[in-house]
Amino acid sequence: MAAKSTDVRPKITLACEQCKHRNYITKKNRRNDPDRLELKKFCPNCGTHRAHRESR
């Protein structure tokens, strides 16, 4: 069985760029997206749509 660190689709958390709150948990494919993932999502803390970036 493969280790979690070498998993092709690991779980990642997305944090708001503005307030740094970790609002979302998702999966990503490391082969297609080797860099940090950045998505525009709604931040309930800020109350607006903001860029959310993968945090470690």
UniProtKB/Swiss-Prot annotation:
Any one Gene Ontology molecular-function term assigned to this protein's record: structural constituent of ribosome
PROSITE patterns associated with the record: RIBOSOMAL_L33
UniProt keyword annotations, A-Z: Ribonucleoprotein, Ribosomal protein
Xref: SUPFAM superfamilies: Zn-binding ribosomal proteins (SSF57829)
GO cellular component assignments: cytoplasm; ribonucleoprotein complex; ribosome
InterPro entries for the chain: Ribosomal_bL33, Ribosomal_bL33_CS, Ribosomal_bL33_sf, Ribosomal_zn-bd
One Pfam assignment: Ribosomal_L33
GO biological process: translation
HAMAP family named among the record's database cross-references: Ribosomal_bL33
Family note: Belongs to the bacterial ribosomal protein bL33 family.
Protein name: Large ribosomal subunit protein bL33B
Organism of this sequence: Nocardia farcinica (strain IFM 10152)
